Amino acid sequence: MTTLHFSGFPRVGAFRELKFAQEKYWRKEISEQELLAVAKDLREKNWKHQAAANADYVAVGDFTFYDHILDLQVATGAIPARFGFDSQNLSLEQFFQLARGNKDQFAIEMTKWFDTNYHYLVPEFHADTEFKANAKHYVQQLQEAQALGLKAKPTVVGPLTFLWVGKEKGAVEFDRLSLLPKLLPVYVEILTALVEAGAEWIQIDEPALTVDLPKEWVEAYKDVYATLSKVSAKILLSTYFGSVAEHAALLKSLPVDGLHIDLVRAPEQLDAFADYDKVLSAGVIDGRNIWRANLNKVLETVELLQAKLGDRLWISSSCSLLHTPFDLSVEEKLKANKPDLYSWLAFTLQKTQELRVLKAALNEGRDSVAEELAASQAAADSRANSSEIHRADVAKRLADLPANADQRKSPFADRIKAQQAWLNLPLLPTTNIGSFPQTTEIRQARAAFKKGELSAADYEAAMKKEIALVVEEQEKLDLDVLVHGEAERNDMVEYFGELLSGFAFTQYGWVQSYGSRCVKPPIIFGDVSRPEAMTVAWSTYAQSLTKRPMKGMLTGPVTILQWSFVRNDIPRSTVCKQIALALNDEVLDLEKAGIKVIQIDEPAIREGLPLKRADWDAYLNWAGESFRLSSTGCEDSTQIHTHMCYSEFNDILPAIAAMDADVITIETSRSDMELLTAFGEFKYPNDIGPGVYDIHSPRVPTEAEVEHLLRKAIEVVPVERLWVNPDCGLKTRGWKETLEQLQVMMNVTHKLRAELAK
């Protein structure tokens, strides 16, 4: 018989119950006991949903109050020593301080979990880090599930992935792999505690196997699993997010009892493991996207596997369902307005039922679930033939693009002369990245307008009032190139998604980004086009208030793609180019309306990098082409800006230069302009605006601090190509500190201009 198990489940609840309880607890509106009760209730509901899908094993240990890697830091005693906390007796309050910081210590750094949009808390390893086991988190959840009469499988991130996703800290140089001999006995203790609590199978997650691991890390798997296999539980080694075919010989040799592979992201790896002689868990339902599976097609694969493996076949989702929204059935608006699209989707609970159907078909025959299989096929057929998805005009436009469609008319050296001829900017021109503070009044007006409580005319008047204020304040500060402040935008992707065809939105399609923060990504379900102008009216109104140049503001195609649930029936590169052409229509309309400085933000270009470096070039080629397609066709005198905010550029600088934006603004203040050095060494050919102060803090920098950064920038970038700007948009700041911060920036700029003019 085929076994059905779950790898992990969303933590926050169908209606973000955990988020709201956490935030009430942080505001001291509920007690710790009340928060614990909400969490216990959510865990029970999650397990019951898994049991209702006829799961043989429910997942335990995956629930967390903040992040599963933070739980592991506590369980192994690897919490940062700088907090002075005892990992053996850590209070919930202290746990949250690790994640959020306190008055004495900054929070543990966050970064993205492999290539997902989930953020984990990065372990801080020192040469002298000591580990100490505390299995309470995992044991408690195992016992809770057992008390409900359920068979449970604890899930723990493995020791090599744990070390891999951490960072070396401290003055002493060392390799974190050297900590393995100290860490391994602690893992043995944790697994032993789980065995003593009744665990039969333990899932150990090693997604690090899907990235380019150095040889010594790969070799280490032999000793690690030789040691862990001595624990008297059965071990399911779980891999996901990509192919592990290159490690097939190693994985087959490890003394574990089963292996999980991701057959959604990497179906081609099945051939490498079809002869595996232990339990093979096939991840066949997508744990990272929201599309209903064609179960008949999936069955073709798993029936062949079952014929080979018999009872050794397990089935599951490709990875934890953490990355998908909870329940499609609550999306009543979507069902009413887009019934076809609704029928093509599957959120977490629907995916559990897809797995139930697959298990029944395998164990009892297809006839036992004939109705469900017919419904799955009908949805797949409807989607394949829908005129809502496939549009001949969009396909033709892409197909008819000439070979040089993504190239500007002239090289940068010619364009910058044409731009400067009319812009007539001083040395060290100043600008803002885009957004200004989103006040309570702005949010209330937007909410009232969406609910129909505020007329379109009144809403427009409220937004224009905010725009006028933003323009006036920038003029008072003497900024050179102005922005309109984006008062009308709730979110930099959602705003455009609502105005482009091929996008849809949910009411409750939340997924956890980190801690209590959840995001509700748009769904790109069909061919993308722009029915009408999206930003022209706002930008031209702002331009009418000033003689200074006004920047048009757009979110770039790659970022819109990365921060959405993307259709899986055509290549992502094709979707990205469709978005690019829709944005290009907007660029040309802005230009026609007299907006001759246009910014196309691409904060997510780096996030899209594939896990394996061999796949980088292909991605960077189509990502760069998409950006250029969005900005092509305009006159040389129109200046295209882009903005990027992340901490590592060196390895993709040629690709960034190939995007050929006239001006790039980047986040650099927190790294003390270190990032800029890479641009200098690379001899980045176009204009650069390094951020001269950190907008993530309300603190107003001193003039000396800003001057220090600007002087460092002048050492690296030719002064005639240097812009001055904050690190990022000002949406999350208050007005008071915003104006004070910008005033400091302007004072320093004026001082250095005077000095350079001598």
UniProtKB/Swiss-Prot annotation:
Query: Binding positions for L-methionine?
Result: 433-435, 486, 601
Q: Does the keyword Ribosomal protein apply?
A: no
- Gene3D superfamilies, A to Z: 3.20.20.210
Record key words, sorted: Amino-acid biosynthesis, Metal-binding, Methionine biosynthesis, Methyltransferase, Repeat, Transferase, Zinc
Enzyme class per UniProt? transferase
Query: For this protein, what does the record note about how its cofactor is bound?
Result: Binds 1 zinc ion per subunit.
* EC number(s) reported in the record: 2.1.1.14
The role this protein plays is: Catalyzes the transfer of a methyl group from 5-methyltetrahydrofolate to homocysteine resulting in methionine formation.
> What's this protein's name?
5-methyltetrahydropteroyltriglutamate--homocysteine methyltransferase
Q: Which organism is it from?
A: Neisseria meningitidis serogroup A / serotype 4A (strain DSM 15465 / Z2491)
The coding gene here is: metE
